Amino acid sequence: MIYLVSNQAELFKSDRYSKISVEKSLEIMDSWKVVQLDTETEGLDVYTKRLLTVQFGTRDIQIVVDCTSVDILQYKSFLESNRVFLGWNLLFDLKFLYHHNIYPNNIYDGMLAEKLIWLGYPAGMKGMSLKDTAFRYLGIDIDKTIRGKINQTGLTEDVIVYAAGDVQPLEDIKDAQEKEIQAQELETAVSFENEFVKCLAYIEYCGVRLDVPRWKAKMENDLERLNKAEKALNDWVVSYYKEHLHDPDSTNTLEVEVDFCLEERVGSKVIKHAIEYKTYTPIEAPRTVTGPDYVSYLKQKLKVVFPFVKINLQGDLFSGFDTEPKCCINWSSSKQVIPLFELLGFNLITFDKVTKKKKKSVDAKIIKAQLDVSPIAALYLDYQGASKVVSTYGQNWLNAINPVTGRIHANFYQLGADTARLSCGGGTANVNVQNLPHDPETRACFIPEDGNDWISADYQGQESRIIASVSNDTAMLDLFINGCGDVHSLVAKMAYSHVIGDTPIEEIKEKFPQYRQEAKGIEFAVNYGGDANTIMNNKGIPLSEAKAIYENFMRGFPGVAKYQDYCRREVMKKGYILLNPVTKHRAHVYDFEELDRIQKKFDDSEFWDYYREMKKYDPSCETVKDVQNYFRRKSASEKQSINYRIQNRGAMMFKLASIKLFNYLKKNNLLGVVKYCIPVHDEINLECPKAMSEEISKILVKCMEQGAKPFCTRLPLGADVSVGEHWIH
């Protein structure tokens, strides 16, 4: 049965539903303990689009409230009661309710529950929409065609019936989900995430203020840095060309003469590009290529070189007769950069994560490991960094400013990673406030409203303390509890023991700053499941040196080594990663059944005989592919079993701190007074009136410390707080 609550007496007359008053609707719902909830709106932005309807329902009764004629505040007491409200993607609905000063207490978000059930599965493998889930559990097909027309049609008879239909299956879906939730012991995880979504909706609703003049000045500086970086690259290529390829008096080169003359038609004008080489010394031919064959080999190689530099021999009256060589590479095109870097001796071969095949790449990670190959590497990395800043942190941020609030309201994804970590980006704002550069120029652009202070608080060495706690490593625990707490110096001492020797940890930062800096990368790599190969690739050092560093690390931190071995064993035994023992979030090895099927064949010696034969004669056969896929996925899952547990604990303490903070603000009527501006994994940024910033700072630190306790049990984890006129950290 569908009921409509509307003050538009002459509109929406239909035999598909009955019209009732607000009072009658509240009377009908008075006995409901569990209420299915949904909204329909004019659009996605709570500040510029209207709330059209709010729907309440059970399996048998649905009530649609016409919010264009009925004040939704008449349902405030009902919505803020202790009833449980079931919804789907309640992050969206809560913001529209918050806009009307309505803050529900008890909610169950079916979409969050579904994501927790399938955490670890690749995006798209299991649909998370209400339509997909209703079909998966109930076998019903929800018609969503009306939803796409609401923005154009507004409230109509079809929209009212559609809105009622959206709340009808929610309780049946919840009942079906609970069987799986109980089987996976996810009850606490579901409850936890349902608490956090209320805070996350408030974060999105608050948004953050951007200092527009300062941002525009930053954009100009960023563009200037990019232009300088591009000029440095162009100058280097031309200089290299002159030194190695264009100097007829060079005595260090083989006397091989190769001439090219290219003609390029631009409109009615013909430009001639002449390249004259005496030789190209960096090219090393295979040892078997000598004499005349070397000349031929060199010519073939030089065909790759000449597009990088052009000379305008013809000129014109307007641009003059500048015959100086000019670099013609588009540095933003990897296709144009790769041939040059290959010619200079860089190894650009990597593996495509999607296709699992070899490919060539000039990504920063690859070039950074080969800084000693050529000076152009550092110049190109500078260019890449400057280019990313210009393209990612420019006009798009100004475009994201809401015309009503003057603030940026970013979109967040509560379970944006398999670790249950929060992620940001996309949506109406399409900017990522969690991935902003750390430089003071950028951070200073984020400011509070006039009369407010900005408050930043971040955990003290969060990851290192979590690792010490979960691994129960005595060296790390002793450092944090009884020592100076400088874990980077401790890692340097363990990894580079042959250099640092018996130097006290307190003195390493001053005496061995380079090794302490190197230790940060080693600590990050190993703590997240990396090995000697990871260190070798990240630092561009020989494997033997990387192995020595890795072995020293593991000897120095036996607790970490033991803990990682345990993680690796458990994941391939259970088929999932227990992310933490408190909430019992888990990330599945999505293809575990297939991997287990393959692994069971390994005990058969005949299988390996067949595998070796097929690998030699038919490497594309199913058996060879199965073995390769097994060990690739096993390696990835084992690394994740180490990495995910650490990241999840960090995410959980951040979420718990945020829940505690939100509840405090709500209890003390400070919602809207204290704004939650930016969450960044281990950092919380607020703004509040100056008169209360000292008090709120203390409350924030207390919430963060309390949030950390259940997930970092063997040592305290505090937070540093700063108060200022803009984002400080």
Residues covered by each model-derived region:
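N-terminal accessory regions of nucleic-acid-interacting proteins
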Residues: M1-T39
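Active-site-proximal helix-loop-helix substrate-binding element of RNase H-like nuclease domains
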Residues: I2-Y17, D45-Q182, V190-L200, H488-Y496, ...
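Acidic, glycine-rich two-metal-ion catalytic cores of nucleic acid-processing enzymes
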Residues: F12-S14, T39-T41, K49-R50, Q55-R59, ...
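Short hydrophobic beta-strand that contains or immediately precedes a catalytic carboxylate
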Residues: V35-D38, I107-Y108, L210, W454-D458
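Mixed-charge, glycine-rich, non-catalytic linkers/tails in nucleic-acid processing enzymes
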Residues: P104-I107, D143, G148-L317, C328, ...
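Catalytic palm subdomain of template-directed nucleic-acid polymerases
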Residues: I117-L119, E171, Y202-L226, I467, ...
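Core structural elements
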Residues: I140, Y162-D175, A183-L210, D259, ...
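Polymerase palm active-site segment centered on the conserved acidic dipeptide of motif C
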Residues: E171, A217-E255, D259, F553-R569, ...
